[in-house]
A protein has these predicted regions:
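The −1 position to Zn-ligating cysteines in a subset of zinc-ribbon hairpins
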Residues: 2
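Short Cys/His-rich metal-coordination motifs, predominantly Zn2+-binding knuckles/fingers
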Residues: 6
Length: 290
């Protein structure tokens, strides 16, 4: 048969190997491609013959993905999504630095100031040395988000950009979040998990953010697109319920409306100017704001 991946004619794999180490999926593994009921099949074909993939291609993608998922340096968990990332040259230093920048993951042997300096250099197109590896901002970089769905896996997103391109988008996200913080707040920047926690009732038994929210927010950050409305709705719901505006919630409001303003490229009367500022404006006459 004709392989949909390689475009070559050859033997087709009937059942693809399982993908393991995805949070929330079966411990024995889950399938990325599977057809296990007649309702999913067409033209009399059975199982994965409905999506013909050559034996070599099926072996290659499952082996490579299982290898990456087994290496904790390439894998990050955010909400219900398992995120795996890698550089084209396969050097793990790219994934390690990306994890520190995007998820606030610990970066051994480097301080937060060191990390910010390296990210700034890469964003400006200058290579940096990280753990004896020279990181090229023009290196192709890939980010894959997977979520469990019973015995199957769902691809939440598969993103490709240069390493420097991803970092520039992440830095733009942090710039939008910038806001005056109280003296007791030790977070220089707000990691993604902390933003998502602002949408959750901290007194509830389940403190997980809404399904799909983590993946949608991460995709918006990495692609430099508008934040999902569900993030804004989740934060405003907690503000109304708890009558408290934390630094994180104020930062989400500011970032959401600033990105909205950037996207529509014109003045929007629905966006109060005060919301876009870094600090509180006590002299405003905007009643909802005050």
């Amino acid at each position: 048969g004709l392989c949909l991946v390689t475009g070559e004619v050859g033997p087709i794999e009937n059942i693809h190997p399982s993908i393991k180490n995805v949070a929330g999926a079966q411990s024995s593994g889950a399938a990325l491609v599977s057809f296990n009921a007649p309702a999913f099949c067409s033209y009399g074909k059975e199982q994965n013959l409905n999506a013909p993939t050559g034996k070599f291609a099926a072996f290659a993608y499952t082996t490579a993905l299982n290898h990456l998922l087994s290496d904790r340096d390439h894998v990050f968990r955010i909400g219900d999504a398992t995120v795996v990332c890698w550089a084209r040259n396969a050097k793990p230093a790219y994934a390690a630095l990306f994890g520190g920048a995007a998820f606030g993951a610990a970066v051994p042997s480097y301080t937060e100031n060191d990390l910010r300096g390296m990210v700034k250099s890469l964003c400006s197109g200058q290579p940096v040395t990280y753990e004896a590896d020279k990181l090229d901002p023009g290196m192709d970089f890939y980010v894959l988000g997977l979520s469990p769905n019973a015995a199957r896996l769902s691809v939440r997103f598969f993103l490709h950009n240069t390493f420097g391109g991803f970092l520039r988008n992440i830095q733009a996200h942090y710039d939008r979040l910038e806001i005056v913080r109280p003296a007791y707040d030790k977070f220089e920047t707000l990691p993604l998990w902390k933003l998502l926690s602002e949408t959750v009732n901290q007194n509830s038994r389940d403190k997980s953010p809404a399904p799909d929210l983590a993946g949608e927010v991460l995709r918006a950050v990495l692609m430099n697109t508008r934040y999902p409305a569900t993030l804004l709705n989740g934060v405003t719901l907690r503000i109304r319920a708890e009558r408290e505006i934390t630094r994180g919630r104020a930062a989400v409001l500011k970032a959401y409306y600033r990105k909205l303003q950037e996207t529509i490229k014109r003045e929007n009367p629905d966006i109060p100017e005060e919301v876009l500022q870094v600090s509180l404006n006590p002299n405003t006459n905007n009643i909802p704001y005050t």
